[in-house]
């Protein structure tokens, strides 16, 4: 063997195994060294090849990882998009299914309607055909009769002119009669058609109004939703602000902790916590964005609804215009009917005349048939006979009568037919309207079907494309599987080659080969290479082997590149099909990653093999050296080499088994992939089957649609006639919209006028006295006028008596003056003509005057009625003002609640709110002034009316004076012209007859007018019926609205349930947090106990070095506590997992399917969008909860880690030194100082909050005083209103009396006689009166216009009142719901507090048990140390400092203050009782006065009745007040019971506090005893050790005693601090609970007092009506609900503040746990 080869071999071994040359050279002399070198060379080659492969694999792996990450991101995006598309397609399919179902139902209904219409049409056609046949028969009979009549007329043409004239007259009359009948029937039909159209229009108006109301309701609902969303947004904004504040606090704390050097390590923020906070912020941002989007959508819906409102208003205007036109047409038709009736009357009169003439002619004709006439006719015309003529004539008359009967029958049939048609006209109209609606709906359905067909075609195309993609993906998967199988085969081949190579190792290598390898190892030169090549026949040269390995590497790389290219192409093709098969691809990716991991594992296994070989070499080298040292036998060396080779074979077998296991795992994964692919194929087949079913359904639906289209075409042909009507209705609707705009403007004006009407109240006081004085004056004038009227009546009676006497004288003188009358006839005729003309003119003027007087009287009556209405409106306005005052009081109470809510805000907010209140008060004052101005304006109008009435009375007086003058003149003229009057009386009688005829005519006219009035009354009845029908429809709408409200309540209940689930989960999280806090406290306690044990162990280690003794594990209480903590952590984890499962099982609220099915496509889409948004919101909330769960899990895991560290620390701290405990103590003291500082800051915050609460209470008291002042003012105003009402009633009575008096005067004036001399004067007076009447008419028109405006304003105000009432009801519902929610939360908090008390008690019991266990351990230690105990040294025993009880005294003071408040409340109740007694006394006095004021006059009987009624009302009110007083007594008793219960609870709480104090003192005493026992035991042990060491030195004893005293003092201080802290915590908890209970009870008492005061104030209002009392009671109930809600809210805010304080205390506890971790780490370092 050459030296170069050996050097090369040695160098190879040195490079490969990192072995020095000196260690390798002794191995050269061994025989198997060459074989070993050849094996190493082959192994080197394999390792180098594997290195290259590993490098390539790592590069490819990195490249694949990058590609895969990109693809995964791309696939995730596509998955999200595909999921979204799938959800959209599912939603579309569900919507289409719902639409198909709705279409089917609608089609069934339409088929039923169509069948009914067809049956009705067939019946109508049958009736028409029958009528046509009857008309044809009648026409044929008429034609036959006409032919017969014409033949008879031709035969009897020679009868004479008289018969012909009679027949012609009869025929004309009959034709006229027929025409009149037809005209009347047609006019009636037209009238009925117009009436029906009118009714249809009224019904359309009602439907439009109902739609308008529905739209208004929708607007209100949307506005409420917007308000709710705004509130939610405000809540979210508050949450965001709170989060920002928390983040700021966290950063501040972090900065503070970072400033400290020792604690900076403890509070290092984890990146995971920051990420979680960022995720929470992002989710909350998403929530805010969702709420904002929801609010914007609702606003858009509100805008759309407003647009619909405008359109409907325009429709309403158009309908009103058409109604006006129809009214005009009806008036025209009525006029035409009157004309026709007049014509009919004239024709009837003519018929009667003709019949009379006919009877005379018939009688004359009958005279011809006498025997003489027959003889004369026979002599004159022997061929002509009168008998034939008579018989023929009689036959003709019979035929005419039969024809008349037939005509009557036909007319009856025609009238019956017309009545049937009239009856069926509304049905046909309804059918037409339904047909129009059905056509519109069919058009809508056709459009929706077209859209659905388009969507289905798109979906089908997408399904086909996805199928193709799935097939392509399947092919690619098969190709990839084949590639994987090929690769697995290659791996198997490589493994087989490795096995072959490993087997060749055990064979013997020739010596020449070994020498060559050694030389190559020592000197890797060309010569050594040639030697190796000669010896190794497998390879021609080493370079060729290297080149072959490089070629193989290049081939592998090329193959890998090809594989990567193929994979990229396959993946590019797969990316197109990933939308539907994303799950399978993700699993494949996971499998690839697992394969990469397996390859990594293989590489690691190869590296392990290399390490094994190195170790084998080391062992072989050591064995060779040992053999060389002991004996140089070659056989022993060979044996060692054989053993090493066997070990290598064993390791190789292990490696081979591992590879087989990996291959089996890969095969299992492939099988799993195949099974998943089969499942995917099955799902695809199911989807195909469902798709086929959907296509079949679609084909059926298309067929149905074609049938519907055919029917729709038929219906469209019918609807063409009705489209004109629809266009008119659209125009009317546009006009309605314009009118609505005008109405809104008027409403705004009315609001201003309402504000002005409040000022009228003050002016009424001033005008009351003036009106009373004027009434007195008017009564005096009335008496004077009555006296004048009586004088006139006496004068007229006397005149009538004188006239009667004169008539007797005139009759006696008639005979004497008859001759003179004959002479004066000619002159009298002229005078009579003149008088006749004058009388006619006077009659006309008198009729006109009387008519105008009647119109004036009617207008006065109308004005009086309008005045009454105005007074009623004023009363209503006063009632509304009272209601508004009540609403103002409610708002003030709400304001007080809002002030209580915002206690944590700054004082600037309260000043701003006070400014707002002042501004609102100024607005109210301005409104009050405007109402006063309006009241002044109405009083001015009343004064103007009174002035007009005075003018009319003055005119009447003037007329009376003129009448007196005229009477005197007429008496003189009568005395002078006495003779002339006697001659003219006869003519006067004639004139009287004519006047009677004219009066008859007037009576006929009045009858006509009465008939017209009757018709108008009938129309009014008809309209009233329509109004009743409209009211019924409104009731139905209200019922529907109630149904909708019930549905909404159900939906809200579902939402409430979901919210309750959400709150329950939050409570679970709170429970988990509380348990975590408990665990932290237990952990801190465990740490303290560990420190104590460390100290004890240190002492024992110092004492018992000479005599150690074993301690059993069972005696360690710490280990038991650690075991308990582990169990608690496990329970927490299970609770969190169960909460997650329960959270996943939460279901969304199930909407009502019936209401959803009734919706259309657009409504369904909006509904689905809303639901999706709500689900997104819920998902965000779920994410927040999941993040909180993660945090809790992490805390639990950290606690588990801490427990593990504890367990290690317990084992390690037996050996640790005392120096480490000192460092831990210093850290613990620092932490305690930090906790004390945080507690101080929290106490300062509490004091600030209490100051703010006191300020708010003072403001509330001021507001209460203001409310009392407002109520007093309100009572004064009500009393003034009642006095004004009484005055107005008196005025109305006086006005009615004046009206009666005026009517009597006018009648007397009309009844008085007149002559020709005063006609001119009367004409002039009439002209002047007509002018006055015109002026009065103008004023009346102005007043009417003003009345109409006031009425419209009052209606608008009533609408606003209804809207406000609805809003108030909604708010009350919300308040009740919130109150229920807050009550449940409060109960939960109370239960938690009770649980905490129980836990604290359990902890105390645990502490006592632990102390007892420690005492037992001490006894055991004493027993084990059975050595003589020396005299214990005297140790100073420091007594524990007692805990200060200042806080306990403060709680007692607070309880005393609450008792004082209760005493004040009882005083207030006593005062209320005294006020009630006063009210009773006043009521009794009022009854006595009412009995004394009875007057027995007949004229005042009516007043008595009124007073009796008022007395009855007062008695009923007094009875009600007595009932209320009884209720108040009961409530007072309940309050007293509550006060007693409070006192008892206070006493019990004091006793509990004293018991807790005693328990704490007992604990302290027990601790002292245990400390003394421990000190005694340790002193015994120490003294024993000191006695042992006393022989050596005396200084050692003194040193040990000093150290022992120091440590004992430190222990006592620690124990005292711990006890004081626990005692303070217990006192704080007790004090907080007592404060909460006392505040709750005080709030309840304040509520009851407010309710009692309100009821007392209502009882004081005696003169107010019963309605106001009922409404006041309702307001008090609403005040209860509103007052309960803020109180509950205040309570919860206080509880939340306390929980925040606890949360702020929690971070230092975490720091203690972190301190424990640092301690454990320090222990490890020290070890």
Curated annotation (Swiss-Prot):
Keywords: Coiled coil, mRNA transport, Nuclear pore complex, Nucleus, Phosphoprotein, Protein transport, Translocation, Transport. GO terms for molecular function: structural constituent of nuclear pore. Residues 1423-1448, 1672-1684, 1702-1714 have a biased composition (Polar residues). GO terms for biological process: mRNA export from nucleus; positive regulation of mitotic recombination-dependent replication fork processing; protein transport. The keyword Phosphoprotein applies. The modification Phosphoserine is found at residue 1706. Gene3D superfamilies: 1.10.287.1490. It is found in: Nucleus, Nuclear pore complex; Nucleus envelope. One of its GO terms (cellular component) is nuclear pore nuclear basket. Residues 1423-1459, 1477-1500, 1656-1727 are annotated as: Disordered. Disruption phenotype: Decreases cut8 localization to the nuclear envelope. Increases kinetochore component protein levels, including cnp3. Asynchronous kinetochore segregation during metaphase, with lagging kinetochores present during anaphase B. Increases spindle assembly checkpoint (SAC) activation and results in mitotic metaphase/anaphase transition delay. Abnormal chromosome segregation; lagging mitotic chromosomes during anaphase B and unequal mitotic sister chromatid segregation. Sensitive to thiabendazole. PANTHER family: NUCLEOPROTEIN TPR, NUCLEOPROTEIN TPR-RELATED. This is Nucleoporin alm1. It comes from Schizosaccharomyces pombe (strain 972 / ATCC 24843). The gene is alm1.
């Amino acid at each position: 063997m050459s030296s170069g080869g050996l050097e090369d071999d040695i160098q190879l071994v040195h490079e490969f195994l990192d072995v020095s040359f000196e260690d390798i050279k002794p191995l050269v002399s061994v025989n198997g060294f060459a074989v070993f070198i050849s094996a190493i060379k082959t192994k080197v080659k394999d390792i180098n090849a594997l290195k290259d492969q590993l490098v390539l694999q790592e590069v490819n792996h990195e490249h694949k990882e990058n590609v895969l990450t990109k693809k995964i991101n791309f696939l995730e995006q596509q998955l999200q998009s595909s999921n979204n598309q799938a959800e959209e397609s599912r939603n579309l399919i569900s919507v289409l299914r719902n639409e198909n179902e709705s279409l089917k139902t609608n089609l069934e209904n339409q088929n039923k309607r169509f069948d009914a219409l067809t049956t009705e049409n067939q019946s109508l056609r049958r009736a028409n055909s029958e009528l046509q046949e009857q008309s044809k028969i009648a026409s044929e009979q008429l034609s036959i009769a006409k032919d017969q009549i014409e033949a008879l007329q031709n035969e009897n043409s020679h009868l004479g002119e008289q018969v012909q004239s009679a027949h012609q007259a009869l025929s004309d009359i009959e034709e006229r009669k027929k025409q009149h009948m037809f005209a009347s029937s047609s006019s009636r039909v037209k009238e009925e058609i117009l009436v029906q159209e009118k009714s249809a229009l009224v019904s359309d108006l009602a439907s439009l109004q109902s739609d308008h109301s529905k739209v208004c309701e929708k607007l209100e609902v949307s506005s409420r939703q917007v308000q709710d969303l705004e509130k939610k947004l405000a809540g979210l904004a508050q949450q965001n602000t709170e989060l920002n504040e928390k983040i700021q606090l966290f950063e501040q704390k972090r900065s503070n902790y970072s400033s400290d050097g020792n604690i900076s390590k403890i509070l290092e923020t984890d990146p995971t916590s920051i990420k979680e906070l960022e995720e929470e912020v992002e989710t909350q941002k998403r929530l805010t964005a969702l709420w904002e989007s929801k609010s914007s959508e609702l606003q858009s819906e509100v805008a759309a609804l407003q647009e619909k409102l405008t359109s409907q208003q325009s429709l309403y205007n158009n309908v009103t215009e058409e109604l006006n036109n129809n009214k005009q047409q009806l008036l025209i038709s009525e006029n035409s009917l009157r004309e026709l009736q007049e014509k009919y009357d004239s024709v009837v009169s003519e018929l009667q005349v003709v019949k009379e003439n006919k009877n005379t002619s018939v009688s004359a004709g009958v005279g011809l048939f006498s025997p003489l006439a027959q003889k004369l006719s026979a002599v004159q015309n022997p061929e002509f006979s009168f008998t034939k003529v008579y018989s023929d004539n009689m036959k003709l008359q019979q035929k005419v009568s039969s024809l008349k009967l037939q005509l009557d029958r036909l007319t009856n049939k025609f009238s019956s037919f017309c009545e049937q048609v009239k009856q069926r006209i509304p049905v046909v109209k309804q059918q037409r309207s339904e047909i129009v609606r059905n056509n519109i709906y069919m058009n809508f359905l056709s459009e929706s079907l077209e859209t659905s067909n388009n969507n289905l075609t798109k979906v089908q195309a997408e399904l086909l494309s996805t199928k193709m993609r799935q097939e392509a993906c399947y092919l690619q998967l098969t190709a990839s599987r084949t590639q994987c199988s090929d690769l697995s085969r290659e791996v198997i081949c490589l493994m087989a080659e490795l096995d072959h190579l490993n087997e060749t190792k055990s064979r013997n290598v020739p010596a020449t080969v070994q020498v060559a390898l050694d030389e190559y190892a020592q000197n890797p030169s060309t010569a050594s290479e040639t030697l190796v090549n000669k010896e190794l026949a497998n390879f021609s040269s080493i370079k060729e082997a290297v080149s072959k390995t490089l070629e193989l590497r290049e081939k592998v790389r090329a193959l890998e590149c090809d594989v990567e290219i193929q994979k990229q192409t396959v993946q590019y093709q797969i990316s197109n099909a990933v939308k539907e098969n994303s799950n399978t691809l993700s699993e494949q990716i996971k499998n690839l990653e697992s394969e990469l991991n397996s390859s990594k594992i293989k590489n690691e296994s190869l590296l392990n093999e290399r390490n094994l070989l190195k170790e084998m070499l080391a062992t072989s080298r050591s064995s060779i050296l040992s053999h060389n040292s002991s004996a140089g036998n070659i056989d022993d060396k060979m044996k060692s080499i054989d053993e090493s080779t066997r070990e290598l074979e064993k390791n190789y077998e292990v490696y081979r088994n591992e590879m087989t296991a990996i291959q089996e795992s890969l095969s299992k994964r492939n099988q799993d992939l195949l099974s998943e692919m089969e499942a995917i194929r099955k799902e695809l087949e199911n989807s195909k089957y469902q798709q086929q079913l959907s296509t079949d359904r679609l084909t059926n639906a298309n067929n149905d649609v074609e049938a519907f289209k055919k029917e729709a075409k038929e219906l469209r042909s019918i609807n063409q006639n009705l489209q004109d009507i629809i266009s008119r209705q659209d125009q009317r609707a546009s006009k309605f919209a314009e009118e609505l705009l005008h109405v809104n403007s008027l409403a705004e004006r009315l609001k201003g006028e309402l504000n002005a009407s409040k000022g009228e109240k003050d002016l009424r006081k001033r005008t009351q006295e003036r009106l009373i004085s004027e009434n007195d004056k008017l009564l005096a004038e009335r008496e004077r006028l009555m006296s004048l009227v009586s004088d006139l009546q006496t004068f007229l009676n006397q005149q009538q008596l004188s006239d009667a006497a004169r008539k007797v004288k005139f009759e006696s003188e008639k005979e004497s003056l008859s001759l003179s009358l004959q002479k004066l006839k000619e002159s009298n005729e002229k005078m009579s003509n003149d008088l006749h003309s004058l009388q006619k003119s006077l009659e006309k003027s008198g009729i006109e005057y009387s008519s105008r007087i009647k119109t004036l009287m009617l207008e006065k009556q109308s004005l009086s009625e309008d005045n009454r209405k105005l007074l009623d409106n004023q009363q209503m306005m006063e009632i509304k003002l009272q209601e508004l005052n009540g609403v103002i009081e409610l708002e003030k109470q709400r304001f007080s609640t809002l002030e209580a809510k915002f206690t944590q805000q700054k004082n600037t907010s309260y000043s701003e709110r006070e400014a707002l209140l002042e501004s609102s008060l100024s607005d109210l004052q301005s409104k009050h002034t405007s109402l006063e101005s309006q009241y002044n304006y109405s009083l001015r109008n009343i004064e103007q009316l009174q002035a007009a009435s005075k003018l009319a009375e003055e005119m009447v007086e003037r007329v009376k004076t003129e009448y007196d003058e005229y009477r005197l003149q007429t008496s003189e003229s009568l005395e002078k012209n006495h003779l002339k009057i006697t001659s003219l009386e006869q003519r006067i009688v004639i004139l009287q007859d004519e006047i009677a005829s004219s009066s008859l005519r007037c009576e006929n006219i009045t009858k006509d007018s009465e008939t017209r009035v009757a018709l108008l009354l009938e129309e009014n009845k008809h309209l009233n019926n329509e109004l009743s029908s409209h009211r019924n429809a409104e009731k139905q709408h209200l019922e529907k609205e109630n149904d909708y409200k019930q549905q909404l309540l159900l939906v809200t209940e579902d939402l409430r349930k979901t919210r309750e689930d959400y709150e329950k989960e939050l409570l679970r999280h709170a429970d988990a947090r509380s348990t975590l806090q408990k665990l932290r406290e237990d952990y801190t306690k465990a740490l303290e106990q560990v420190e104590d044990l460390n100290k004890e162990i240190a002492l024992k280690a110092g004492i018992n070095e000479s005599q150690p003794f074993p301690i059993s594990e069972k005696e360690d209480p710490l280990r038991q506590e650690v075991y308990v903590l582990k169990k608690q952590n496990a329970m927490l984890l299970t609770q969190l997992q169960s909460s997650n499962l329960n959270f996943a099982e939460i279901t969304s609220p199930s909407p009502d399917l019936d209401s959803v099915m009734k919706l259309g496509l657009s409504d369904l889409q909006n509904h689905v969008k809303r639901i999706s948004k709500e689900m997104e919101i819920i998902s965000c909330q779920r994410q927040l909860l999941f993040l909180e769960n993660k945090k809790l899990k992490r805390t639990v895991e950290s606690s588990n880690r801490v427990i593990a560290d504890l367990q290690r620390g317990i084992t390690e701290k037996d050996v640790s030194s005392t120096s480490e405990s000192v460092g831990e103590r210093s850290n613990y003291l620092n932490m305690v100082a930090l906790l004390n500082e945080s507690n101080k800051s929290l106490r300062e915050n509490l004091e600030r909050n209490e100051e703010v609460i006191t300020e708010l209470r003072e403001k509330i008291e001021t507001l209460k005083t203001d409310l009392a002042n407002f109520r007093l003012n309100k009572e004064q105003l009500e009393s003034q209103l009642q006095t004004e009402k009484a005055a107005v009633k008196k005025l109305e009575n006086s006005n009615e009396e004046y009206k009666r008096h005026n009517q009597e005067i006018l009648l007397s004036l009309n009844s008085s006689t007149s002559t020709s001399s005063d006609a001119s004067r009367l004409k002039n007076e009439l002209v002047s009166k007509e002018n006055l009447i015109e002026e009065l008419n103008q004023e009346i028109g102005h007043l009417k216009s003003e009345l109409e405006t006031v009425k419209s304003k009052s209606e608008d105000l009533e609408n606003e009142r209804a809207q406000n009432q609805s809003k108030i009801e909604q708010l009350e519902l919300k308040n009740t719901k919130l109150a229920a929610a807050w009550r449940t939360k409060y109960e939960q908090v109370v239960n938690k507090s009770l649980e905490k008390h129980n836990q604290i008690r359990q902890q105390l019991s645990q502490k006592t048990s632990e102390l007892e266990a420690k005492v037992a351990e001490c006894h055991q230690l004493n027993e084990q140390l059975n050595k003589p105990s020396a005299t214990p040294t005297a140790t100073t025993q420091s007594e524990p400092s007692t805990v200060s009880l200042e806080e306990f005294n403060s709680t007692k003071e607070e309880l005393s203050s609450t008792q004082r408040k209760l005493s004040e409340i009882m005083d207030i109740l006593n005062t209320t009782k005294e006020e009630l007694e006063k009210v009773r006394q006043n009521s009794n006095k009022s009854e006595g006065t009412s009995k004394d004021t009875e007057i027995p006059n007949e004229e005042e009987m009516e007043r008595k009745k009124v007073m009796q009624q008022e007395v009855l009302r007062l008695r009923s009110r007094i009875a009600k007040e007595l009932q209320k007083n009884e209720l108040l007594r009961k409530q007072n008793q309940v309050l007293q019971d509550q006060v007693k219960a409070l006192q008892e609870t206070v006493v019990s709480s004091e006793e509990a506090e004293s018991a807790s104090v005693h328990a704490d003192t007992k604990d302290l005493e027990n601790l002292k005893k245990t400390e003394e026992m421990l000190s005694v035991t340790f002193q015994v042990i120490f003294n024993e050790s000191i006695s042992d060491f006393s022989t050596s030195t005396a200084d050692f004893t003194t040193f040990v005693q000093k150290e022992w005293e120091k440590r004992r003092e430190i222990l006592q201080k620690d124990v005292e601090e711990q006890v004081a802290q626990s005692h303070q915590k217990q006192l704080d908890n007790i004090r907080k609970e007592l404060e909460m209970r006392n505040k709750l009870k005080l709030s309840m008492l304040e509520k009851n007092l407010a309710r009692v005061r309100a009821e007392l104030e209502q009882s004081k209002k005696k003169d107010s009506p019963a309605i106001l009392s009922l409404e006041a009671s309702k307001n008090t109930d609403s005040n209860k609900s509103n007052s309960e809600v803020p109180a509950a809210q205040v309570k919860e805010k206080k509880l939340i503040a306390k929980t925040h304080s606890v949360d702020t205390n929690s971070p230092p506890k975490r720091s203690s746990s972190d301190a424990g971790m640092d301690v454990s780490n320090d222990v490890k370092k020290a070890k």
